[in-house]
UniProtKB/Swiss-Prot annotation:
<feature type="domain" description="CP-type G">
    <location>
        <begin position="62"/>
        <end position="213"/>
    </location>
</feature>
<dbReference type="InterPro" id="IPR010914">
    <property type="entry name" value="RsgA_GTPase_dom"/>
</dbReference>
<keyword id="KW-0547">Nucleotide-binding</keyword>
<dbReference type="GO" id="GO:0046872">
    <property type="term" value="F:metal ion binding"/>
</dbReference>
<dbReference type="Pfam" id="PF16745">
    <property type="entry name" value="RsgA_N"/>
</dbReference>
<comment type="subunit">
    <text>Monomer. Associates with 30S ribosomal subunit, binds 16S rRNA.</text>
</comment>
<dbReference type="Pfam" id="PF03193">
    <property type="entry name" value="RsgA_GTPase"/>
</dbReference>
<keyword id="KW-0862">Zinc</keyword>
<dbReference type="InterPro" id="IPR012340">
    <property type="entry name" value="NA-bd_OB-fold"/>
</dbReference>
<feature type="binding site">
    <location>
        <begin position="111"/>
        <end position="114"/>
    </location>
    <ligand>
        <name>GTP</name>
    </ligand>
</feature>
<dbReference type="InterPro" id="IPR031944">
    <property type="entry name" value="RsgA_N"/>
</dbReference>
<keyword id="KW-0699">rRNA-binding</keyword>
<keyword id="KW-0342">GTP-binding</keyword>
<feature type="binding site">
    <location>
        <position position="244"/>
    </location>
    <ligand>
        <name>Zn(2+)</name>
    </ligand>
</feature>
<keyword id="KW-0378">Hydrolase</keyword>
<keyword id="KW-0479">Metal-binding</keyword>
<dbReference type="GO" id="GO:0003924">
    <property type="term" value="F:GTPase activity"/>
</dbReference>
Length: 290
């Protein structure tokens, strides 16, 4: 039988096949091979009934996220709050870099718009991201049609209202929500488990909130590929390995000078590039000491 893992709990894997969910375990040979089944995996399994089955094999994955481990994702809704906590373009771009690198389609959702006096600033931000090619939503009415026939994960900084949004989309989930701590300005983690839920003709998964995010991109080329607007422009740079920092005849810097590239995104790119280089230097020093 074939199916997809929709939940994992205490060593059991719940596999959905033709609308029926089977409780299964992984064969011991998975541990010997260093393989671990994850939510989202397509698997071959055997089962005598719905409560006692075994996973026999795992199909190749198209992508994966580490925190939490979840695989074969179509798209991700990145929830950013307009206020409390304040909108943070740097953090949003970290999420977008990760998703671009993983080849997961991003959807940007802005929460807590009611806390703003007006939408002038956030409308300007929306226009910039839409010009790059990103889908940008203000309401669940805009978001809901995008969920059909997709596996969607929800992610974002703690306190941005992920669980609140999911409870509005699917009240039957009854996810716990946490308020912002006045002393820390951060939300309490309220999401503890990862499961797929059938919502609006698609499958969604909630993921634990992040107060920070480390992306897996570790070189300039992959970073460039993870910024769509830089990726498009880089074909016109004189040097194929252009980092868009000091090289002559750089199409990215020319676009920036002409106002065709958003300065905020370019500054974040430079910061991420610097972080990559610093990590590399730190790694070299550690290796040298050994």
């Amino acid at each position: 039988m074939q199916g997809r893992i929709v939940k994992s709990l205490a060593g059991f894997y719940y596999v959905e096949s033709d609308g029926v969910v089977y409780q299964t375990r992984a064969r011991g040979n998975f541990r010997k091979k260093g393989q671990i089944p994850y939510v989202g995996d397509w698997v071959e399994f055997s089962s005598q009934d719905q409560s006692e089955g075994y996973i026999l094999s795992i199909e190749e994955r198209k992508n994966s996220l580490v925190r939490p481990p979840i695989v074969n994702i179509d798209q991700a809704v990145v929830i950013m709050s307009a206020k409390e906590p304040d909108f943070n373009a740097n953090l949003l771009d970290r999420f977008l870099v990760l998703l671009e690198y993983k080849m997961i389609q991003p959807i940007i959702y802005i929460s807590k718009l009611d806390l703003l006096d007006d939408l002038v600033v956030i409308d300007d931000i929306r226009e910039h991201y839409q010009n790059i090619g990103y889908v940008f939503c203000y309401s669940q009415e805009e978001l809901l049609p995008l969920l059909a026939d997709k596996v969607t994960v929800f992610m974002g900084q703690t306190g941005v209202g992920k669980s609140t949004l999911l409870n509005k989309i699917a009240p039957e989930l009854k996810l716990e929500t946490g308020e912002i701590s006045d002393s820390l300005g951060r939300g309490r983690h309220t999401t503890r488990a990862v499961s797929f839920y059938n919502v609006h003709k698609g499958k969604i998964a909630d993921t634990p909130g992040f107060s920070s995010l480390d992306y897996e991109v570790d070189n300039a080329e992959d970073l460039n590929e993870s910024f769509p607007e830089l990726r498009r422009l880089s074909h016109f740079c004189k040097f194929r390995s252009c980092t868009h920092t000091h090289e002559p005849k750089c199409a990215v810097k020319e676009a920036l000078t002409q106002g065709q590239l958003w300065q905020v995104r370019y500054d974040n790119y430079l910061q991420f590039l610097s972080e990559i280089e610093n990590r590399r230097e730190t790694y070299k020093k550690v290796i040298k000491r050994k």
